[in-house]
């Protein structure tokens, strides 16, 4: 569950 966190940070 590390990609979801990274994606959320990149999207926001």
Swiss-Prot record:
Source taxon at top rank: Bacteria
Protein name per the record: Putative PyrE leader peptide
Protein's organism: Escherichia coli
Gene: pyrL
């Amino acid at each position: 569950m590390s990609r979801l966190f990274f994606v959320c940070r990149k999207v926001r």
